[in-house]
Regions:
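C-terminal soluble interaction/assembly domains
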Residues: 115, 122-139, 145-147, 153, ...
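Extracytoplasmic/peripheral linker and loop segments enriched in polar/acidic and small residues
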Residues: 85-86, 167-208
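Soluble non-cytosolic domains of exported or imported proteins
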Residues: 9-17, 41-48, 89, 101-108, ...
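Flexible, low-complexity junctional segments that flank or bridge functional domains
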Residues: 1-32, 36-62, 76, 80, ...
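Extended C-terminal subregions enriched in glycine
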Residues: 94-116, 120-128
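Extracellular/periplasmic catalytic domains that process cell-envelope and extracellular macromolecules
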Residues: 1, 25-28, 87-92, 115, ...
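Gly/Ser/Thr-rich loop/hinge elements
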Residues: 41-94, 132-138, 149, 153, ...
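Active-site-proximal beta-strand/loop segments in catalytic clefts of secreted hydrolases
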Residues: 6-10, 35-38, 64-67, 98-102, ...
Length: 213
């Protein structure tokens, strides 16, 4: 009745056909649990590709600021970032994204965008942050330096660098840990099965060759 996906690294490539097949596999489910706990980040392109499958329309996802001088606060005015829905199979049933303090970088951005969607609930713990675009260089002494060069703001122009709070905070209990039970997944399942109004995924947007499979 409930679909479950764990995505542990946004550096791992995600193909469009893989996403099509995933949503078809879960088409009879009441909702999906999308688990990104302990995901340290990776490629923003993968984050966007997945997020597009949950959109109904083009949305403002946030803002980015670029360095324009040597001063501490010499940044450009916030530049808006937008994301459009995929032209393939999209999912509009309930989704619960599981997070914890080990969600960084592209994962932080993924959560920042997904929480804007009305059918998505963020559950677990605050993310780790670190959402700015990274810059890497080498000092004359041979040391490598990596830092966030372009601050990213959310759709309300608030900094996300220090993490994003969940819609519903859930922590692992000692009792469940001793039993090998995942408190957060159990809470997500209970929420999805609680009887929310559901909508069907748009099968018309999937390619004919995938439907034939």
């Amino acid at each position: 009745q409930v679909g479950y996906v764990y995505y542990g690294n946004f550096s791992s490539g995600v193909g469009e056909s893989n996403l099509d097949n995933m949503f078809l596999h879960f088409k009879d489910c009441k909702g999906i649990i999308f688990d990104v706990r302990n995901n340290g980040g990776g490629a923003m392109s993968n984050s966007d590709r997945i997020t597009q499958r949950f959109l109904e329309e083009k949305i403002l996802t946030g803002y980015v600021m670029y360095k324009k001088g040597n001063g501490h606060n010499d940044f450009s005015t916030p530049y808006p970032l937008y994301l459009s829905p995929s032209d393939r199979l999209c999912w509009q049933k309930p989704v619960i994204v599981l997070t914890n303090r080990h969600c960084y970088s592209a994962t932080n951005n993924f959560v920042s965008t997904m929480r804007l969607l009305p059918h998505v609930t963020i559950m677990g713990d605050r993310t780790g942050g670190g959402s700015g675009f990274p810059f890497t260089t080498e000092l004359p002494i041979g040391w490598s330096v990596r830092f966030s060069a372009c601050p990213i703001l959310d759709a309300d122009k608030k900094h996300t660098e220090f993490g994003i709070d969940p819609d519903q905070e859930v922590a692992m209990t000692k009792e469940d840990m001793q039993k090998g039970k995942d408190t957060i997944i159990e809470a997500a399942i209970s929420r999805l099965l609680s009887g929310s109004e559901l909508s069907e995924p748009d099968i018309n947007k999937i390619s004919p060759e995938i439907l034939a499979d």
